[in-house]
């Protein structure tokens, strides 16, 4: 149809409409509704676009508060106002058109009004997408969409290998395991049909393709009772959620009446005399686990406003029980199962240590297996272990005790608030939380081994399974065969022999017991210092394992200045027992090393340790606060006093001054008053790609940094939510980043990688080789998806069993955590990935973390336990990324703590890389001062809503701080695959332009037709 014919068609249709209008007022009234309907449609379209943007940008990657949405809208207000003005103009034009008596002019104005409203939507969406939300959309619509088939297969093989060696055999009475091939199994426990594959939050993974627990049993050749499976599935199909989106501690399990009404036990006995019982517990980001299943069943946590349910099964409510004990319904089920079946095997499917004393209270429980968060294919490994195809070689990464309500940290875990600080500017609820790390260095096994040695506890009455414990289907002998000692380094050769009948792997563990003076530097009697895992040893086969131990690695940190003027690492004179162990408690062989005189690693004595760039001295005295810490002095004489819960809820005055740093921040404390404004916006002709391999201190960096404008410096630092922004002056491409520690987990983009076993399972392998293999596999998946930054690994400490994200972290031990992290990080670094190891530091629980919880601890404990894995990763794996945490050291937010980030991390350890924040949101901005943070060593802000007003003061001090941050960011990127990233516009931009072009062309054609029609009719009327 030609333009003339199309114009004639439109004209004839208009004439027809005119004649219809003469038919009466009803038709005219309906026609007047048309522009209103169109206006409503335009508004709806604009709303849909807004909702879609919200879903894309805030689709679950981080916790989004209402205030974040308000803040994001505030950033878009100019674009929204412009769109609203055009929309209103369109409506006004429509109304004016309707009032015109000239039908020709009326038709023209109606079209103009409609076009204006369409343009309002188009312009608003475009100005928002290419303006304040450009970086977020670039993140949402980033990269490729698939992992290569080769890498998928490699990942699945690695995941299964990790589970093969991470699942831990706890009990095997009378060699009840492995089970005979083809054994019929009654699988009891609701968790058998809804097992725990992983955790919730940033460390979650996609388990939609996972092999179920029952799948794993079937693949291993077992036949299971389908009546039981159907019974549990019909009872409940989904596991209750524990995350920051909602908390339900219900432990699903049918009542005994329901079992009996369905004749479950009678029918099961007819099926088989063997029972497998599955006990599962879940956990996730945003909530610690319930220490009491309170009778007050429902309440709301103030921090995120989520609803908490202790149990929807009222008969399970028990204020004396925790979530990590058997529920009343589970006990009833076990009573019946152990009465009816002679061979009962238990699977513990929980990332947290549970109270398991009941395993020894039922005579018919012959075996027990610990299987924490096995991921996508890990339950296949469980089946293989039960059948004997795989010999278990996992070892515990936490101490399992009989009574979790008696652990030293129990009274100082949870939510405690200061009562005398009522003016927290910006805080919605005026709550200032705190937690006391009262146990000092005596965390996990270090307490139990030392307390037993000092006579405080009867070890066997308190500890059920030691740290490092794990059984095998075979037996091993291990002994120290040779030692070489030059006074600086000890070399041990350990011979391991398989003395059983089945091939297996063994983990020789070396702990040292240092000399201790009563009232002196605090020391534990057992400290893991090296370990290895053997190859698969056939029956009768031996392997010699060599270990090297540096003397300085046995030094303790003297934060109380007992032997050093300013605090230092001190290797005291005396005998050091170097113990070969099967776990933290059972010593197999010993070598004694003697140090003749104290070695004090400060500038006045030995100088710095060989691994340090600068001498370590006290920088965190204020973190100690007014807390009484557990001491070994007098055989733990202050045990009762130190482990009691807080009694003083008044906040120290000096702590108050620091806490609300947005109010108290003073740039003059950081800035040189005589500092000169750096050069910005220079034209030096350098590109980011030119900096690949250039040394951090090379003067060439100054030339590149001089090219950045102040606005670019601000955006590099401030706009860092799952990306690094493209920067035109240096040709820096857009860099994509993603979660998480267990799997590629991009809620923003909807891209999910292989669901590996959780980090706790990786650590439970005690295999550095497998940890490195995990790093390689997740690194390959990150590369396939186009991500350069990885928000992992998670390296916090299992301070106690109730911490919600223990699945996401490795262990209660800093050294073991460090070894796993080193292997993973070294592997991903080889692939050009920047790992943001997190959450730095003392973020060992979820309760109140988003309120900047004040964390009080000794500097000795901070250095020896909580900083240890980060230190190891920087020194041994050249880690070049850190994600700091939302909590505070003392009362100073980590992100604003220059003592830790600049002095210790960059100074002592020589770190040269990016330090980014955990999510910054509008709720917590009253203590997360980004102006101070960038001066204190934080380089990049994970802001839910970016605004450059954080650095409205463009003083020399501010620009210098932003320039330093840019240097850190760009240096890390120059040593990553970012140097090879495509520098053109993102693909989504071209798609957007194409859609815009189509809309504009269609509108233009419509305008041409409309104007031609108007002019033709006007001419016709004039001639008439």
Predicted segment positions?
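Short beta-strand elements
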Residues: 586-609
């Amino acid at each position: 149809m030609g333009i003339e014919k199309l114009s004639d068609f439109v004209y004839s249709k208009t004439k027809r409409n005119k004649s219809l209008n003469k038919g009466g007022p009803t038709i005219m009234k309906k026609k007047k509704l048309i522009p209103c309907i169109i206006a409503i449609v335009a508004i709806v379209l604009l709303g849909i676009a807004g909702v879609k943007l919200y879903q894309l940008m805030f689709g679950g990657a981080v916790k989004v508060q209402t205030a974040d949405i308000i803040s994001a809208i505030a950033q878009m207000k100019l674009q929204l106002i412009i769109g609203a003005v055009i929309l209103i103009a369109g409506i006004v034009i429509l109304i004016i058109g309707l009032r015109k008596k000239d039908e020709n002019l009326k038709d023209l104005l109606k079209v103009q009004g409609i076009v204006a409203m369409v343009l309002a939507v188009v312009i608003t969406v475009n100005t928002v997408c290419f303006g304040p939300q450009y970086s977020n959309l670039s993140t949402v619509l980033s990269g490729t969409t698939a992992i290569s088939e080769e890498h998928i297969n490699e990942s699945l093989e690695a995941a299964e290998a990790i589970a093969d060696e991470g699942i831990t055999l706890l009990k095997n009475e009378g060699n009840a395991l492995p089970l005979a091939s083809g054994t019929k199994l009654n699988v009891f426990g609701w968790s058998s049909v809804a097992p725990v594959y992983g955790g919730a939050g940033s460390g979650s993974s996609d388990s939609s393709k996972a092999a179920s627990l029952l799948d794993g049993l079937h693949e291993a050749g077992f036949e299971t009772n389908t009546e039981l499976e159907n019974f549990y599935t019909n009872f409940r199909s989904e596991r209750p959620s524990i995350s920051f989106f909602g908390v339900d501690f219900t432990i699903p399990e049918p009542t005994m009446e329901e079992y009996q009404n369905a004749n479950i036990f009678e029918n099961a006995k007819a099926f088989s005399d063997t029972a497998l019982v599955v006990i599962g517990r879940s956990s996730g980001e945003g909530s610690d686990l319930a220490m009491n299943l309170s009778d007050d069943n429902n309440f709301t946590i103030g921090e995120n406003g989520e609803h908490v349910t202790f149990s929807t099964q009222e008969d399970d409510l028990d204020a004396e029980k925790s979530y990590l004990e058997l529920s009343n319904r589970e006990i009833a089920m076990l009573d019946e199962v152990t009465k009816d079946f002679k061979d009962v095997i238990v699977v513990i499917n929980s990332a947290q240590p549970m109270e398991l004393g009941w395993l020894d209270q039922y005579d018919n429980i012959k075996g027990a297996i610990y299987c924490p968060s096995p991921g996508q294919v890990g339950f296949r490994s469980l089946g293989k272990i039960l059948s004997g195809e795989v010999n278990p070689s996992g070892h515990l990464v936490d101490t399992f005790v009989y009574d979790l309500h008696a652990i030293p940290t129990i009274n100082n875990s949870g939510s405690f608030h200061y009562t005398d600080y009522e003016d927290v500017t910006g805080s919605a609820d005026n709550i200032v939380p705190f937690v006391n790390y009262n146990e000092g260095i005596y965390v996990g096994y270090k307490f139990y081994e030392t307390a037993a040695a000092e006579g405080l506890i009867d070890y066997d009455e308190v500890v059920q399974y030691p740290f490092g414990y794990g059984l095998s289907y075979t037996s091993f002998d291990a002994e120290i065969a040779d030692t070489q000692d030059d006074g600086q380094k000890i070399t041990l050769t350990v011979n391991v022999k398989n003395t059983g009948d089945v091939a297996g792997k063994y983990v020789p563990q070396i702990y040292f017991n240092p000399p201790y003076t009563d009232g002196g530097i605090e020391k534990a009697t057992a400290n893991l210092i090296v370990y290895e895992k053997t190859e698969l040893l056939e029956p009768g086969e031996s392997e010699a394992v060599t270990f090297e131990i540096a003397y300085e690695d046995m030094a303790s940190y003297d934060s109380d200045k007992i032997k050093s003027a300013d605090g230092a690492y001190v290797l005291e004179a005396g005998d050091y027992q170097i113990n070969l162990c099967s776990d933290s408690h059972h010593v197999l062989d010993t070598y004694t090393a003697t140090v003749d005189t104290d070695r004090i690693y400060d500038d006045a004595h030995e100088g710095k340790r060989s691994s340090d760039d600068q001498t370590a001295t006290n920088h965190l005295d204020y973190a100690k606060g007014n807390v009484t810490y557990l001491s070994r002095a007098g055989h733990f004489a202050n045990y009762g006093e130190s482990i009691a819960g807080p009694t003083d809820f008044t906040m120290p005055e000096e702590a108050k001054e620091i806490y609300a740093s947005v109010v108290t921040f003073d740039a003059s404390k950081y800035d040189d008053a005589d500092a000169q404004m750096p050069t910005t916006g220079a034209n030096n002709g350098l590109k980011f790609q030119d900096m690949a391999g250039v040394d951090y201190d090379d003067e060439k960096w100054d030339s590149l940094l001089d090219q950045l404008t102040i606005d670019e410096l601000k955006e590099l630092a401030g706009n860092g939510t799952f990306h690094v922004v493209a920067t035109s002056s240096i040709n820096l491409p857009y860099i994509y980043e993603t979660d998480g520690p267990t799997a590629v987990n991009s809620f923003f983009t909807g891209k999910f990688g292989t669901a590996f076993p959780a980090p706790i399972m990786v650590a439970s392998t005690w295999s550095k080789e497998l940890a490195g293999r995990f790093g390689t596999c997740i690194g390959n998946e990150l590369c396939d998806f186009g991500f350069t930054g990885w928000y992992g690994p998670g390296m916090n400490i299992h301070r106690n069993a109730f911490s919600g994200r223990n699945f996401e972290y490795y262990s209660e031990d800093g050294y073991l955590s460090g070894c796993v992290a080193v292997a993973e990080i070294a592997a991903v670094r080889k692939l050009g990935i920047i790992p943001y190891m997190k959450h730095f530091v003392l973020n060992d629980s979820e309760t109140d973390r988003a309120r900047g919880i004040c964390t009080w601890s000794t500097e000795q404990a901070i250095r020896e336990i909580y900083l240890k894995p980060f230190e190891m990763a920087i020194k041994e794996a050249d880690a070049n990324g850190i994600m700091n945490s939302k909590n505070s050291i003392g009362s100073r937010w980590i992100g604003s703590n220059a003592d830790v980030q600049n002095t210790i991390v960059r100074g002592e350890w020589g770190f040269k890389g990016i330090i980014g924040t955990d999510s910054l949101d509008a709720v917590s901005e009253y203590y997360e001062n980004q102006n101070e943070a960038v001066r204190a060593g934080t380089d990049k802000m994970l802001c839910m809503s970016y605004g450059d007003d954080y650095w409205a003061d463009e003083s020399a001090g501010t620009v210098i701080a932003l320039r330093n941050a840019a240097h850190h960011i760009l240096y890390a990127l120059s040593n990553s695959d970012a140097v090879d990233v495509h520098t053109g516009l993102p693909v989504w931009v071209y798609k957007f332009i194409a859609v815009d072009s189509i809309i504009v062309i269609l509108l233009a054609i419509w305008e041409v037709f409309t104007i031609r029609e108007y002019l033709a009719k006007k001419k016709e009327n004039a001639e008439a």
